């Protein structure tokens, strides 16, 4: 499978490090084999879109720029020269040699660049970043040491202190993500329609309408099978694309030799200059077609996390780049000697008659593979947006148990399918779709260039001059291409702009509402002084059981707690405040994921657990969550007692109490139960009849029977692992034993989940725009997205939702 080995295989860094350390040639051979294997696999995942560009580049270039009247050998050579230098400058020089080096712990893409900037400077708009997050292993790149210069310090302060600049940065990132989603709408129609249009070369009776219906049928089938996952056929992706690329290269060589070997001269930029001298404004407008030769380039960086930079470089330099150059050169040789050919089908007309049908079949398969790669990338970008609080919650399904990155979102899938069919039937012509496609491609690359310039300054800590040179060298070229694409806004170029504006509006409104809700929680959180004044009973009735309260606060007590106890003065004997929090790193290691601490003195039995996840982590269903939580709290209690013993902290003073309640510790899942002081038994294990009878006589047996009835109808809840905890007799500290006993008793009594069901309203004094954004747009999105209880896999029978109105 294309991604299986890259996520579970040998780490290139480890191999190189080992090889460098002991000089063993075997390690280097393993490393090279690993790189070549990943390079082979990347052909099917990364380069499917880029490899299908020869189907429509020359057609779009000559039609968009009205170059048919200039179609002579020198102009054709000029078009090829533009394609060659475009492929050399942007995909090869910019992406392969520069951008791929800006990985975020091996991950790439627009959000990887933004994550790097947020971690190395305070550019985030979300106020929930804590100092403890900076202690994560993956937070800073190895060997990072801040180096401040007067210019860098001034630039950093300007961006950090001006909220509008940080908002502009976020909107830029969201715009780039929206354009990637737009690619997911435009790539399937463009690729499939272009491949099927070849049928009209040898079947003149086939009408354009029939080609469109055939293309829509294939697109519907493609989206219908998404829920099955691509892992069953993914092993065919790389062979299909490699055969297609080798075929492109061979056809290119054939056309060069047969039609016009003089096309080799067009590698010189001389023909590029002559092209603009002859064509003028028409030549500039035709850049919108040249732009299509780069479609799919961003995938090299976006899919970096599935492979390695070395493997992607090897695949591009060793196979993709030479095959594409040969194909474009061969088409130019054919065009230069065939001035009367139908430019709409130039690729298929350049194919020798004897192999036309095999090439058409492989072209169709390559188009489907390229479309699948973009669809999967769209699912991935939506997941990342959701993790960072920039997209409404949608359902994420894992289609493979072995490959973590294979995901599927039903809502996004059907939206993409409807949009793809609408584009195919609405625009109909690949030239119009190409105008839209080029706009999206140029926009994504320009966003990457802008973010990359900031990374060069703030992350790599090079001088601003180096960043300026990078920005000028690539940004100016991409801006020229974008300006040419903008000329075709009335002829299809409006589509990616409309799609991007819609998606950016959805993302920003959701992020704005989420941010204002968090600010309200921070401003209205319960004072610890109020908690202390209530005493150990908190002024309410403490009932048996564990109450798990979900909150977005990583510190303090949320207002939902005081709202609940004010209206219903009873709560569980053990309270655990849980904050599921996204941090700006791609992945958080399991042993660093949970921060555990306590709120108030020991006798209050109030704890806090912060669950941290990266923007590429998925919150999968954890059937052992409750048991893991108990074990982690027990581990924290033991760690705290050990620390107290070492530091000789007294427990009878106010100072000790304050110090205790301020502690937070990273607590991994205990591998040794003896460290927790608890014994864990499976149901029925060493359980006496007397114990079972005593348990049945307890009031919570009724609750247990209700749970059992619900489990028969809820397989997901029934899959939760049931165990019984016992306190070991090894404790010498009576406080620890008492606290663990209370924890175990509460766990056996049952667990309830409390979550806020908030209604966000704009204040009456707010502007009309803010009222519309909060009261209408955000409320609509929140009502129609998945609830947080479903996302967090909370059992419905144990969930209590507390309604609150937030005036922001």
From Swiss-Prot:
Membrane topology: Multi-pass membrane protein
Cellular localisation: Membrane
Gene from which the chain derives: HAK3
Family stated for the protein in its record: Belongs to the HAK/KUP transporter (TC 2.A.72.3) family.
Cytoplasmic topological segments: 1-34, 103-167, 226-232, 305-313, 376-406, 461-464, 513-808
Organism annotation: Oryza sativa subsp. japonica
GO molecular function: potassium ion transmembrane transporter activity
PANTHER family xrefs: OSMOTIC STRESS POTASSIUM TRANSPORTER, POTASSIUM TRANSPORTER 3-RELATED
Highest rank taxon of the organism: Eukaryota
Database matches in InterPro entries: K+_transporter, K_trans_C, K_trans_N
Main subcellular localisation: membrane
Protein name in UniProt: Probable potassium transporter 3
Gene Ontology CC annotations of this record: membrane
TM region(s), chain numbering: 35-55, 82-102, 168-188, 205-225, 233-253, 284-304, 314-334, 355-375, 407-427, 440-460, 465-485, 492-512
Extracellular side: 56-81, 189-204, 254-283, 335-354, 428-439, 486-491
Protein function: High-affinity potassium transporter.
Keyword field: Ion transport, Membrane, Potassium, Potassium transport, Transmembrane, Transmembrane helix, Transport
Any one GO biological process: potassium ion transport
């Amino acid at each position: 499978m294309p991604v299986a080995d890259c996520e579970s295989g040998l780490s290139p860094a480890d191999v190189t490090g080992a090889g460098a350390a002991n000089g063993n040639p075997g390690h280097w051979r393993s490393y090279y084999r690993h790189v070549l294997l990943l390079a082979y696999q990347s052909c099917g995942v990364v380069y499917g879109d880029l490899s299908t560009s020869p189907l429509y580049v020359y057609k779009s270039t000559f039609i968009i720029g009205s170059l048919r009247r200039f179609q002579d050998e020198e102009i054709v050579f000029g078009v090829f020269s533009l394609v060659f230098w475009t492929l050399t400058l942007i995909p090869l020089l910019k992406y392969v040699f520069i951008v791929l080096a800006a990985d975020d712990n091996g991950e790439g893409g627009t959000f990887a660049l933004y994550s790097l900037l947020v971690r190395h400077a305070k550019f985030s708009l979300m106020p929930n970043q804590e100092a403890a997050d900076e202690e994560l292993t993956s937070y800073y790149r190895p060997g990072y040491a801040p180096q401040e210069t007067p210019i860098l310090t001034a630039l950093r302060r300007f961006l950090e202190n001006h909220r509008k600049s940080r908002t502009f940065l976020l909107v830029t990132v969201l715009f780039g993500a929206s354009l990637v989603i737009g690619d997911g709408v435009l790539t399937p129609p463009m690729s499939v329609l272009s491949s099927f249009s070849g049928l009209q070369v040898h079947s003149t009776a086939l009408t354009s309408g029939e080609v469109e219906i055939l293309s829509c049928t294939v697109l519907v089938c493609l989206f219908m099978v998404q829920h099955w996952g691509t892992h069953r056929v993914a092993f065919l992706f790389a062979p299909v694309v490699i055969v297609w690329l080798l075929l492109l290269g061979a056809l290119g060589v054939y056309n060069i030799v047969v039609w016009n070997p003089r096309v080799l001269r067009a590698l010189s930029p001389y023909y590029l200059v002559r092209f603009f001298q002859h064509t003028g404004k028409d030549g500039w407008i035709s850049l919108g077609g040249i732009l299509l030769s780069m479609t799919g380039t961003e995938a090299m960086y976006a899919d970096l996390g599935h492979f390695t930079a070395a493997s992607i470089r090897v695949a591009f330099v060793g196979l993709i780049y030479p095959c594409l150059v040969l194909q474009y050169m061969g088409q130019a040789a054919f065009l230069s000697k065939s001035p009367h050919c139908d430019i709409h089908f130039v690729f298929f007309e350049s194919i020798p008659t004897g192999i036309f049908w095999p090439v058409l079949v492989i072209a169709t398969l390559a188009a489907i593979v390229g479309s699948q790669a973009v669809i999967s990338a769209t699912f991935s970008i939506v997941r990342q947006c959701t993790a960072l609080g920039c997209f409404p919650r949608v359902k994420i399904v894992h289609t493979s148990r072995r490959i973590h990155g294979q995901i599927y979102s039903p809502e996004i899938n059907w939206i993409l399918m409807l949009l793809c069919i609408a584009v195919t039937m609405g625009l109909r012509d690949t030239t119009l779709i190409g105008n839209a496609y080029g706009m999206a491609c140029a926009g994504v690359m320009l966003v990457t260039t802008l973010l990359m310039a900031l990374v060069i300054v703030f992350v790599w800590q090079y001088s601003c001059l180096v960043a300026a040179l990078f920005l000028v060298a690539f940004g100016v070229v991409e801006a020229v291409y974008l300006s040419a694409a903008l000329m075709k806004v009335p002829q299809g170029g409006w589509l990616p702009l409309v799609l991007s504006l819609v998606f950016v509006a959805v993302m920003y409104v959701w992020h704005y509402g989420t941010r204002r809700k968090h600010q309200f929680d921070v401003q209205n959180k319960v004072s610890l002084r109020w908690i202390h004044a209530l005493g150990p009973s908190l002024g309410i009735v403490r009932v048996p059981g564990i109450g798990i309260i979900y909150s977005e606060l990583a510190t303090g007590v949320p207002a939902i707690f005081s709202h609940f106890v004010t209206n219903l003065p009873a709560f569980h004997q053990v309270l655990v405040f849980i904050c599921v929090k996204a941090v700006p790193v791609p992945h958080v290691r399991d042993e660093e994921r949970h921060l555990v601490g306590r709120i108030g003195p020991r006798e209050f039995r109030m704890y806090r657990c912060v669950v941290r996840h990266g923007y590429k982590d998925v919150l999968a269903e954890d059937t052992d969550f409750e048991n893991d939580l108990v074990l982690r709290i027990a581990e924290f209690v033991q760690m705290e007692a050990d620390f107290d013993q070492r530091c000789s902290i007294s427990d009878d003073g106010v100072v000790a109490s304050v110090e205790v309640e301020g502690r937070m510790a990273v607590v991994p899942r205990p591998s040794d139960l003896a460290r927790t002081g608890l014994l864990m038994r499976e149901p029925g294990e060493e359980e006496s009849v007397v114990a079972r009878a005593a348990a049945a006589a307890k009031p919570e047996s009724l609750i247990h029977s209700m749970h059992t009835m619900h489990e028969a109808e809820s397989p997901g809840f029934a899959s939760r692992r049931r165990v019984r905890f016992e306190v070991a007799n090894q404790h010498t500290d009576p406080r620890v034993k008492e606290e663990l006993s209370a924890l175990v008793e509460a766990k056996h009594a049952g667990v309830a989940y409390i979550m806020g069901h908030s209604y966000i309203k704009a204040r009456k004094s707010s502007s009309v725009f803010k009222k519309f954004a909060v009261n209408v747009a955000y409320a609509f999105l929140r009502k129609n997205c998945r609830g947080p209880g479903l996302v967090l896999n909370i059992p419905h029978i144990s969930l209590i939702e507390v309604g609150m109105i937030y005036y922001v």
